[in-house]
């Protein structure tokens, strides 16, 4: 390490050696990820996120000078890292793979947990991602201001804030922290309150914070920069000669620039004039950098409109790239600088392979899935697969007429649907949807999209089950009444009493010896047609097939001839719900059938 100057200041050469550490913010929905970053940077991005849940990765550079200002007199260390670059990963657990990309890019992570709610499903998922990528992390135990009796001290470090609390409040905080310690232990992590830790390589630090009041945030920032410098220093050393690599956050039209890319540069360097390869839904683009624009520090790249042009940018940084032919660039995919002696086509092939691994287009039965970015698509595909919902097509872009026709070709009514995340429906697709009556689910919040589809699917299943059971031929038995033969044949019309079960139109009848006699074509009571008759009713029925006096006689018992497949369903699913008279008729019917075939209906 180079020698520092006497006053503890860092030389420009030293600063340039270390890149800004990338910090990933992860956690459960509504536990305060975006609010925490808002508190740090003083912006209000959270207010215009759909459903107040961040749905696209954002990037915020917090310079060391701001961290020093925030921490005040508590800032005593001589630090060489230039600041922190926060990636605000989407809050909902469906974005596993987008988070995974964030996790793989991140040098450090903040796992934010509502101290009053504890671990939730997405908290656990975030931990698993961090474990998978071996990303060091700290826990921000948020919403301490909601502990009953808490006295807020705006932007105070934890030591000062705790000094103003009652003993009972401090005890409550301690209890909640140790509940988190217990939860973390379940997942294989030793943890403690950050100011009680001797070795951060072995113990996860828990930092009580309030994103609303700013309490504990100075401690959080100090711990992050300290960890980065102490344990990640070698990983942060920049090799300026290395060709840049980044992830495309968003594709945007900018006045005077045309189509631009918002990019997280996570490795190497990018310069004006560099040849770059950019991922698209189909073939990657090979183009040249026309301009590089960098937001002023403390500005979130999605929210900033005024940018400073620069000649080159070194990782890690959030930048805007202007170049020709970017119209089809795909958000969430890779951007790479072509280094000296490298083959652009070979790099394009690598990027294409990455994208093809996500896109799905098979002949199997499944839903049609459309999303606005490759990251959204990855998350949705993972979520649907986890729920065992098959996918026929998964692609980026608006809902097209072709998508509708593909959905209509799916014969399974539960899967003949289109799911659209944050995408529009093209006009010709809309008219086709109305014509073919294809269910379409749209939302710009992932969990809302999935919940609405799942709710519809459950209702549809119930409807289909009801229709299936209604189509089952039910047990029924009638006795032909004496002196009630109104017509002998073509069709035979006789008066009957329903002695058990139900009779309805178009059901076949058999005698007690198993002989088929004909099919009920009509049922009347007091000269009025009725759809069915139940036990105890006396009605007239018309029967196609028999002649009274030959195949059927007064006093005969006739049974509804239940198809064997239906008999199995009745035996397995419906028998326990049937009335006693229905059960008796069904068992007598089975007895008749099994005289000839003992395995019938089994």
Curated annotation (Swiss-Prot):
GO molecular function term, any single one: GTPase activity
One cellular component (GO) term of this entry: cytoplasm
Annotated region described as G2, given as residue ranges: 52-56
Domain spans labelled tr-type G: 18-233
Classification via Gene3D superfamilies: P-loop containing nucleotide triphosphate hydrolases (3.40.50.300), Translation factors (2.40.30.10), Translation initiation factor IF- 2, domain 3 (3.40.50.10050)
Alphabetical list of Pfam families matching this protein: GTP_EFTU, GTP_EFTU_D4, IF-2
Tagged with keyword rRNA-binding: no
Residues that coordinate or bind GTP: 27-34, 88-92, 142-145
Segments of this protein annotated with the region G1: 27-34
Region G3: start-end pairs: 88-91
Positions of the UniProt region annotated as G5: 210-212
Keywords on record: GTP-binding, Initiation factor, Nucleotide-binding, Protein biosynthesis
Record carries keyword Metal-binding: no
Region feature (G4): 142-145
HAMAP family reported in the protein's UniProt record: IF_2_A (MF_00100_A)
Role, per record: Function in general translation initiation by promoting the binding of the formylmethionine-tRNA to ribosomes. Seems to function along with eIF-2.
Protein family according to the UniProt entry: Belongs to the TRAFAC class translation factor GTPase superfamily. Classic translation factor GTPase family. IF-2 subfamily.
Name of this chain's protein: Probable translation initiation factor IF-2
